[in-house]
Amino acid sequence: MRLIPLKNDEQVAKWSAQHIVDRINAFNPTEDHPFVLGLPTGGTPLKTYRELIKLYQAGKVSFKHVVTFNMDEYVGLPKEHPQSYHSFMYNNFFNHVDIPEKNINILDGNTPDHDAECRRYEEKIKSYGKINLFMGGVGVDGHIAFNEPASSLSSRTRIKTLTPDTLIANSRFFNNDVSQVPKYALTIGVATLLDAEEVMLLITGHQKALALQACVEGAVNHLWTVSALQLHRHSIVVCDEPATQELKVKTVKYFTELEAYAIHSVI
């Protein structure tokens, strides 16, 4: 595992966006051989999307031959609802770059057969061979996508019941009314994430400090979904200083020295 400890969330956004661009350009994608990118929603990746848009506008990258798969979507929320993850992705990213509509993949939370939709999604991913890079965020309790604490580390795309903590956390997007937050979501599984060639998690803010500690210093534990990243052969955690508050000083020092070149690339 690589840990990139940066000063603030602005640096996290710049570093992660540049890393995605570098990976896409090094891959040299074509229509017949596209780069496959996994994407999250939520507050943490917003600044990364803004940086990606800037890099696209500056001519540093094209998304014409990039295929995307999003992590999750609420069940029962219309696609056009302002808080659906469809709306989030189009408003904050897809509408601002040159990605073809046919290359965008987001789970359909309104399908009558959720199990069939989840199987279709897994099969679609496999049709491309693998996801080349999956970017993700992490919840306060260490969940990735909607893989809540105690999710199976061998899980695949499926329907999940959201925990009370997640409902409360997400109520800020629904006028702080928990009753308006969908109770279920379709989500990729932990094993789906770990199948990706590379996984990059963004962890920012002091409220995520325990999750970062579980990810880097803790044992692999299904109660901390994020700890499964330790099992991945090519994983990167990009974090800011507030998120490192629960890490041992020597841990931060070790990775700061180890990743000195990567860190200075955004300073």
From Swiss-Prot:
Keywords for the protein's UniProt record, in alphabetical order: Allosteric enzyme, Carbohydrate metabolism, Hydrolase
Hydrolase recorded as keyword: yes
Catalyzed reactions per annotation: alpha-D-glucosamine 6-phosphate + H2O = beta-D-fructose 6-phosphate + NH4(+)
Notes on how activity is controlled: Allosterically activated by N-acetylglucosamine 6-phosphate (GlcNAc6P).
EC assignment: 3.5.99.6
Pathway(s) where this gene product acts: Amino-sugar metabolism; N-acetylneuraminate degradation; D-fructose 6-phosphate from N-acetylneuraminate: step 5/5
A family per Pfam: Glucosamine_iso
Catalytic site: 72, 141, 143, 148
Protein name from the UniProt record: Glucosamine-6-phosphate deaminase
Species: Mannheimia succiniciproducens (strain KCTC 0769BP / MBEL55E)
